């Protein structure tokens, strides 16, 4: 499940206050160096930090009902709505939520028509060394191993640069492709989250997948 950010830092702070590590740990993380969202390269892909200029490219997934089937919001009705969603995502400090756009390489060059999807981390809790991952792919690019390649390099960034101990993925039972991808990367299915969220006023159940740094094969 790809997640769009909705919570402000104030909401995160309230959540931190409820955590058993308390507000002191929240304020400690606020004094850490600013979180960076670097470009990440693989053999076939480049992952770049999301920017507002990506609106037209991103609309290829945000405006596609098939691509958005397992997303936590309905498809964008037009380009303007996609732009608003990107602006909202970009307003969140990358300490909590960050998104990469995924591009294929062609003769070492990148172009708008080579955009294939996105990967993000969200719900990050630095004091618990935990975050969640989401990904979304243009359907015509499925079955080529692109998203596994993209998620793998993001996992490497999370476990090393961000010093994450646990990564979670919340996947609907019907989303068989994403479940298989998570399992290929080493995630373990840990439980069922019944009616965990509502999309278009309909409840959705998710399965929780978890990957510990000690389980990760790199």
Predicted features along the sequence, with ranges:
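Cationic, low-complexity basic patches in intrinsically disordered or flexible, solvent-exposed regions
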Residues: 5
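GNAT-family acyltransferases
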Residues: 9-12, 20-140, 157, 161, ...
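Membrane-interacting alpha-helical segments
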Residues: 115, 119, 171-181
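Conserved catalytic-core motifs of GNAT/GCN5-like acyltransferases
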Residues: 123, 168-170, 188-206
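Conserved acetyl-CoA-binding loop-helix of GNAT-fold acetyltransferases
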Residues: 135-137, 143-160, 176-184
